[in-house]
Amino acid sequence: MNMTVEWSPQRTRATEQGQPLLRLAGVSRRFMAGDREFLALKDINLQIRAGELVAIIGASGSGKSTLMNILGCLDNASSGSYQVNGQETRDLDDDALAALRRDHFGFIFQRYHLLPHLDALRNVEIPAVYAGVPQAGRHQRARELLTRLGLAGHLANRPSQLSGGQQQRVSICRALMNGGEVILADEPTGALDTASGKEVMNILLELHAAGHTVILVTHDPKVAAHAERIIEVSDGQIVDDRRTVREVAKPVEEVQPAAERAPRRLVASLGLFREAFKMAWIALISHRMRTLLTMLGIIIGITSVVSISAIGEGAKGYVLKDIQAIGSNTIDIYSGKSFGDSRAKAIETLSPADVTALNELYYVDSATPVIGQGSLVRYRNIDADVQLNGVSEQYFQVRNIPLAEGIVFSADDARRQAQVVVIDHNTRKRLFAPGVEALGQVILVGSLPCTVIGVTAENKNLFVAGNSLNVWMPYETAAGRVLGQRHLDSISVRIKDGLPSKRVEEEVNKLMLQRHGTKDFFTNNLDSIMQTVQKTSRSLTLLLSLIAVISLVVGGIGVMNIMLVSVTERTREIGIRMAVGARQSDIRQQFLVEAVMVCLIGGVIGIGLSYGIGYLFALFVKQWEMVFSLGSIVTAFVCSTLIGIVFGFVPARNAARLDPIEALARD
C-alpha cells in the first residue's frame, strides 16, 4: 500500500539533546510461580534512541514479551533502572505510568485488541479521550488517520465487519492518535495473510521514516529483517544486538502535532465524564437483555417506594378531607375530665352564657351550644328513632354541613322558639317516599309538631355513621319545648382562619376556667386529631417504604453481581483501555457510571410504572386517588443514584485494580 503518514511524533527533550529515548540498566524481572521464583529477564542493559527501528526477536518464552511490557510501561522491573525520555519509571505510581503510556507510546497488538462494541472511529479515539482532547479535534484527527490508512469508507464499521488487515490498520491509527512517539508492535503481522502482513509492514516502515521510534517484537526473522537494529533475546538475556545494512531514517523536520489537548483540567474532567456516560450507554445497549434483567430489581424497588408513598399521601388526604368535613378549625368543649368520665352527666355547668362569652373572644369565629337526646319522630304512619340536636343557627357553618335543599333556621327562629327543623338525608329517606317533597311537611318530634325547612346533603364521611338519623332544631326550642334542659351537653367553637388552633385552645381553656372556677370541662381539638392522623400516616408510610427499600437493596445487590460478572467478561477491554492510557480512576469512573446509569434508568422506568399504577388505581378506586409528590420523585432519583454508587463501587474498584498485562492476556 503506497501512502504517506503525515502525523509525526512530537520532539522530546531526549531527542533534542541526543540522549537515548529509552534506557534500561541492570533490569531484571522476577515472577512467583507457586513457591518458586521465576526469572523472566536477567540484567538487561539496553538503549534505544528516538527514530530507531528496532526488532526484538526471540523464541516463545525467551522474555521478549516481558521486555516489551516493561518498555511500554505495562509492567515494572523487579530491579534495575528504566528511564523514558530521561524520567525514571521505578518510583512512578499507576496513574503516572498510565500518563507515560498515553503520551509516549502507541501499542499495536497481534490480535488487534479492538473493542467489539465500538466502531472504527471510536476505537481510534479512545487514547485521545483519556488525554482530554476536545471532541471536535478528536473526531477530526481520527477521521484523518483512518482516511490516510485507506479506511475512509469503514469509519462506522465495527471490528466484526472488518478484515484482519483492516483491523490492524485501525489498531495502528489508535497507536498514532496521541502522537505515537514510540510504536510498540507485538507480532503485528502474526495473524495476517501475506498480503495484509506486507501492507502493515509498509505502514510501519513509513512511520519510521516519518520519525517515529518503532519497536517490533517478533519471532519471525523475516519481519525482524525490516529493522535497522535487531536485538535477540534468549532465556531472559540479550544475546545479540546488531545493526543491519539499512540506513537510519531521518525524522522529518515538519512536525504536525497530535490533536490539541484540553486547555484546562476542569474541561478535561468534564469531557472524560461525558465520554464515560457515552461509553456506558454503548456498553449497556450492546447487552440489552442483561441490562434489563439488571434493572429489574431497581425497577421493582423504585416502583414500590414511589407507589407506597403516593398511596400513603392519597390515604392521608382522604382521611384529612373527612376530618375537615366534620369541622376544621373546631374545638369542642364537654363536661367532665375526659371522654368516658362517669361523673360527666352529673356536671351541668356548661351554659348559654359560656357560649356568649366565647363568641366575644378575638380568636373565635363563632360558638354554638349543643344539646342532644334520642327522640321519636313521626310523619303520618311512619316513625323513626333519631338523634335530636338543639343547636344555634351557626352550627351548620361550624360543622361544615351543607344543605341539599331548603334553609337553616335563623336567630329570629331561635328567639321565638320556632317549631322548625332541619333533617338529614337518611331521615328524609326514612320518612318520605321518593318523589315526595320534604320541605314544608310537618313531622312530630316527640309530641311537638315541627315544619321541615331544610334537608342536609348525603354524608359519606369516614367519621360519621352512614346509617344515623339526625334532626336539628333551634337550641331554645329543644331546651324549652322538647327536652326541658337548660344546661348544655357541649359547645362547638370555630376558630378564625389562619390562627393557631393550639393557642386558641389555650385561650378557651383559660376563659372557661375563669368562668367556672374549676376544671370541670375538657376540650377536644379536631386539629390535634388531624395532626395525629398526619403523624400516623407518615409513620405508616415510612414503615411501608422501609419494607419497599428492602427490594431496592436486593436490586442493588443484583446490580453489583451483574457488574462483577461484567468486569470479568470485559477484562480484556479494561486491559486495552489501560494500555492506551486510562488511569485507574478512569476505569473506576467508567464502571461506576455504568452502575449509576443502570440504576437511574431503572428508577425512571420505576417512576413511570408508578404513574401507570396510579392511573389504573384511579379507574378502579373512585373514593380517593394516589398522590405523587415531587419529594417522592426526587427521593427515588437520589435512591437510584446512591444504589448505583454504593453497589457499583466494588465492581468498579476491582476493575481499576486489574493488572493490564493479565487483563490483555485474558480471552
From Swiss-Prot:
PROSITE patterns, A to Z: ABC_TRANSPORTER_1 (PS00211), ABC_TRANSPORTER_2 (PS50893), MACB (PS51267)
Cross-referenced Gene3D superfamilies: P-loop containing nucleotide triphosphate hydrolases (3.40.50.300)
Topology relative to the membrane: Multi-pass membrane protein
Protein name: Probable export ATP-binding/permease protein MacB
EC number: 7.6.2.-
Membrane-crossing residue ranges in chain numbering: 292-312, 540-560, 601-621, 630-650
Broad class of where this protein is predominantly found: membrane
Broad class of enzyme this protein falls into: translocase
Subcellular location: Cell inner membrane
